[in-house]
């Protein structure tokens, strides 16, 4: 799963390119119009009052620009940003060290904020609400609590699983925005912008071909652009035309809907081994040699969005669209099952 070209999960190779391609201001940020409008209004209001921005929660599938937006917020507010992640903040002391290093108005960005431990969360509550740290000195009956004042800061939290956030944490965010999958026309603009920055010659048709196979995700679009560039350099004249893009993506085993070998294997497993379903998540995971969480969080969302897979009370079911895409004839009972749910 980690080696999938079309995975929206960040890979080490993405880091350098992401930095060079990442927009710095809201005016440069393509797509997510509602989110941009909301954040822009609150940024302007906070700057007009000379106050830090209220705490912001960004949630949605991976690769849609949550980290980019956090950096844009810092740039628009004219402040510094400190970046960490839920798994990296293991102990309350780790969080206390970060919070005490912030200056007035700074942004603290916590990626995967749903993975913070409960003990760390409890330290975060007064920091978000009262801009203070409650520190316990000593142990036993002689222990006493000391409150340490913090500079007013803005916490920007990002998560792909908003449902795992506790209510006390979620309720302390003043601005909550959901990022959606990108439209093909927005991805075309992103591909063209990235191509200009990277010095890649690409036609409008070539950009569209890459965009429509990018699973609605800018990170995937930029990754595909780089790989198609390599193919064009070796197998063509270096220019990404529609024909070159189609050939390159076929070579990379990314089909016109953005599915790769792993997606097709999952669908074929359900169809060929379990008659199209319904079949349970644990059974599917065992059959494809993946963890259930990987199947549920990585594979299923895009297949469900395309309408090729359905979650029902009895289990997962492949739809007639999945059969047709794989060149198979939908079974009669498959059609009946999907219509019932």
Swiss-Prot record:
It comes from the Bacteria. GO terms for biological process: DNA recombination; DNA repair. It is found in: Cytoplasm. Its EC number is 3.6.4.-. Homohexamer. Forms an RuvA(8)-RuvB(12)-Holliday junction (HJ) complex. HJ DNA is sandwiched between 2 RuvA tetramers; dsDNA enters through RuvA and exits via RuvB. An RuvB hexamer assembles on each DNA strand where it exits the tetramer. Each RuvB hexamer is contacted by two RuvA subunits (via domain III) on 2 adjacent RuvB subunits; this complex drives branch migration. In the full resolvosome a probable DNA-RuvA(4)-RuvB(12)-RuvC(2) complex forms which resolves the HJ. Belongs to the RuvB family. This is Holliday junction branch migration complex subunit RuvB. It comes from Pelotomaculum thermopropionicum (strain DSM 13744 / JCM 10971 / SI). The lineage of its organism: Bacteria, Bacillati, Bacillota, Clostridia, Eubacteriales. The gene is ruvB.
């Amino acid at each position: 799963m980690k080696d999938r070209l079309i995975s929206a999960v960040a890979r080490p190779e993405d880091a350098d390119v992401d930095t060079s391609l990442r927009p710095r201001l809201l005016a440069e940020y393509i797509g997510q119009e509602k989110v941009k409008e909301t954040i822009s209004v609150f940024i302007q209001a906070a700057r007009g009052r000379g106050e830090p921005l209220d705490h912001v929660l960004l949630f949605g599938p991976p690769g849609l620009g949550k980290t980019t937006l956090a950096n844009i917020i810092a740039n628009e507010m004219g402040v510094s940003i400190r970046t960490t992640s839920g798994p990296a903040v293991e102990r309350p002391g780790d969080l206390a060290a970060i919070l005490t290093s912030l200056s007035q108005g700074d942004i603290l960005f916590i990626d995967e904020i749903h993975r913070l431990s409960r003990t760390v969360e409890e330290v975060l509550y007064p920091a978000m609400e009262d801009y203070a740290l409650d520190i316990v000195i000593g142990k036993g009956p002689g222990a006493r609590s000391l409150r340490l004042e913090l500079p007013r800061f803005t916490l920007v939290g990002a998560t792909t699983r908003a449902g795992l956030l506790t209510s006390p944490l979620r309720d302390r965010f003043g601005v909550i925005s959901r990022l959606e999958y990108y439209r093909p026309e927005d991805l075309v603009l992103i591909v063209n912008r990235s191509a200009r920055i990277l010095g890649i010659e690409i036609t409008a048709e070539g950009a569209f071909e890459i965009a429509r196979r990018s699973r609605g995700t800018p990170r995937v679009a930029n990754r595909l652009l780089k790989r198609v560039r390599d193919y064009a350099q070796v197998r063509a004249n270096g220019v990404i035309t529609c024909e070159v893009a189609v050939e390159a993506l076929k070579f990379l085993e990314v089909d016109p809907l953005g599915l790769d070998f792993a997606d097709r294997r999952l669908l074929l497993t359900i169809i060929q081994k379990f008659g199209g379903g319904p079949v349970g998540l644990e059974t599917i995971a065992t059959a494809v040699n993946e963890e259930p969480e990987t199947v549920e969080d990585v594979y299923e969302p895009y297949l469900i969005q395309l309408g090729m897979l359905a979650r029902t009370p009895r289990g997962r079911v492949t739809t007639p669209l999945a059969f047709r895409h794989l060149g198979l004839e939908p079974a009669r009972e498959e059609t009946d099952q999907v219509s019932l749910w």
